[in-house]
């Protein structure tokens, strides 16, 4: 079982590397780690388990956050209609994104960042993702709103980008016009 001790923190070189694609068939280790990443997210959202194991609540995690510079991630997040998006995705790529932008009202956080970083992180409100499941089956997934923000945050990790890289340095509270704000 993964715990917070397994997650590398900002400053670790794996968080700034561009991760390499996995090849199929996946190794047993890659499959196991993907499943453990999803299990971590599920456990972190369970109040009792989170307290028992000292887990910070998370909705997404990428392999580089575990010092594994390979292109896979897990998300476990509900949208505003309580629809669950629960996936382990290998070699995810953003196929298309909306012109309409969105952000979270309270900014973003990260399991690898142990401090609050104020500021808006403006992202696409909708994205279409191409990816593979653990068996190498191609997937085409659409995300909107909060789940779209989460998946973009995790794909950024695969490209060595941290959420705060997107924050306006001169004015962190600057919000461009016509950005939809969630939360």
Curated annotation (Swiss-Prot):
What protein does this entry describe? Answer: Peptide deformylase
Co-factor remark: Binds 1 Fe(2+) ion.
> What does the record list as GO biological process?
co-translational protein modification; translation
Function, as annotated: Removes the formyl group from the N-terminal Met of newly synthesized proteins. Requires at least a dipeptide for an efficient rate of reaction. N-terminal L-methionine is a prerequisite for activity but the enzyme has broad specificity at other positions.
Residue positions binding Fe cation: 110, 153, 157
Q: Is Transmembrane given among the entry's keywords?
A: no
Which UniProt keywords are given for this protein, alphabetically ordered?
Answer: Hydrolase, Iron, Metal-binding, Protein biosynthesis
Q: Does the keyword Metal-binding apply?
A: yes
Native species of this protein? Listeria monocytogenes serotype 4b (strain CLIP80459)
The family classification in the record reads:
Belongs to the polypeptide deformylase family.
Q: Which domain of life is it from?
A: Bacteria
- One of its Pfam families is Pep_deformylase
Question: A single GO molecular function, which one?
Answer: peptide deformylase activity
The record's top EC class is: hydrolase
Q: So what EC number does this one have?
A: 3.5.1.88
The positions flagged as active site in the entry are 154
Which cofactor(s) are needed, names only? Fe(2+)
Alphabetical list of PANTHER family matching this protein: PEPTIDE DEFORMYLASE (PTHR10458), PEPTIDE DEFORMYLASE 2 (PTHR10458:SF8)
Q: Which NCBIfam families match?
A: pept_deformyl (TIGR00079)
Reaction it catalyzes: N-terminal N-formyl-L-methionyl-[peptide] + H2O = N-terminal L-methionyl-[peptide] + formate
Q: Which residues form a coiled coil?
A: none
